[in-house]
Amino acid sequence: MPQAIVALVGKPNVGKSTLFNRLSLREKSIVHDLPGITRDRKYAKANLFSDLIVVDTPGLEFAAAGSLEFNMMQQSLVAINEAHIICFVVDAITGILPIDEECANLIRKHNKQSSTILVINKTEKPIILDKSYYKLGFSESVCISAKHGQGIYELGDIIQNILSEDKKINFLTTTNTKCEYNQQRPELELAIVGRPNCGKSTFINAILNEDRVLTGPQSGLTRNSVEIDWEYYGHLIRLVDTAGVRKKNAVTQSCELLSVNDTFKTIRFANIVVVMIDATRGLEQQDLSIISYAVNEGRGIVLVVNKWDLIKKKKEFQKELSRLIAYSVFQIKGINPIYISAKEKFNLESVLQQCVLTYASWQKRVTTGTLNQWLAKAMSNSPLPFQSHGKRVKIKYCTQTKARPPTIKLFCNNIESIDESYKRYLINNFKLNFDIAAGVPVRLSFVKGKNPYR
């Protein structure tokens, strides 16, 4: 069924993100007292009301072309242009300021077809609307408190009335399919993570072939995780751009801490994590920490080295990187980094292909019979050690208990006698035998006992 797009627009710090979270019933946008936290458009299904997509936008600030504030405003203008309904959010505490009047004029200029609702936020206490609110020129208005949920259903009633009465709204003319949340759950949740300024947002813009998220030389431009639904050769993919992750002791501002926590939350909910490394800085401890976290969460890993066009001694770089990976993260032993230049759009297709292949491996299942045939052969090629009293350790049976990632339960007579090196042997042999991508962690669970099926 077609979905209407409702854009939340206004100057910084009027409560757009709080309202966005309230309408979507999920804390998808970071809320902070510091202005300018939201820098990209964020879309979500409005769970309070059926068939609506709600859009959070950066605060409108009028600045010189090329500045961060100007680029943020361009993001807001995209939302204004594509919206069926605009919720123009103002702050009841500050009242109407000249910047609010400028915002109202901007909305009228860039979207003459849509209906606009004046949403007066932060009205925890009753207020009397003076003429400055009416001078903005919008016929529909509602007082709310996004923080406490007051007036939200009244806002919903106004939206539903506009949708049912306004004949100018034609959902079938909506062309921006990237912004709409597909009713079908995305097949693949793909998170792009890494240190600040390694090129995550540039990579996403390059594969989408549009300036979807903010980019620039400044470190830390992305603060919220930004979700974008996108189709790749029949695969419905949710791309998630994330805030860069610095070392813990380097994070001093509370807003950055919220951004980092949001990134780690994104990793936990992703299927595949593209860990992006800045080639000009090489593999650092923070990259390894991100990889280890994603592996421990059971996510599939695709390792990408960006800014490859800036490296002169390429063979030496590749050799050293392979050595560091093999030494540091055994769970993804043998992973082949993909070398790209997001800026030059070099080798991006290889990343997407590897993501799809890794996803297939990540959710792979092996029948119990085939699994036990593999186990017998693996133990025959490399027998388990003897116990102290001369009896050989035996793994009697195994079964796959889950996929995403593959998890194998093994029944044996002495768990303590199976050392880490033999566990690594089994994992590597399993991956090799069943063509599991190197970036997929495989989990082994050892249980003391007999074959439960005998």
UniProtKB/Swiss-Prot annotation:
Membrane in keyword set: no
UniProt keyword list: GTP-binding, Nucleotide-binding, Repeat, Ribosome biogenesis
GO MF annotation list: GTP binding
Domain KH-like: 364-450
Iron is among the record's keywords: no
Domain EngA-type G: 4-167, 188-363
Annotated residues for binding of GTP 1: 10-17, 56-60, 121-124
GO biological process, one term: ribosome biogenesis
Annotated positions binding GTP 2: 194-201, 241-245, 306-309
Cross-referenced InterPro entries: G_ENGA, GTP-bd, GTPase_Der, KH_dom-like, KH_dom-like_a/b, P-loop_NTPase, Small_GTP-bd
Pfam families: KH_dom-like, MMR_HSR1
Family per similarity comment: Belongs to the TRAFAC class TrmE-Era-EngA-EngB-Septin-like GTPase superfamily. EngA (Der) GTPase family.
Alphabetized HAMAP family for the sequence: GTPase_Der
Subunit structure and binding partners: Associates with the 50S ribosomal subunit.
Described function: GTPase that plays an essential role in the late steps of ribosome biogenesis.
Record-linked NCBIfam families: GTPase_EngA, small_GTP
Protein name: GTPase Der
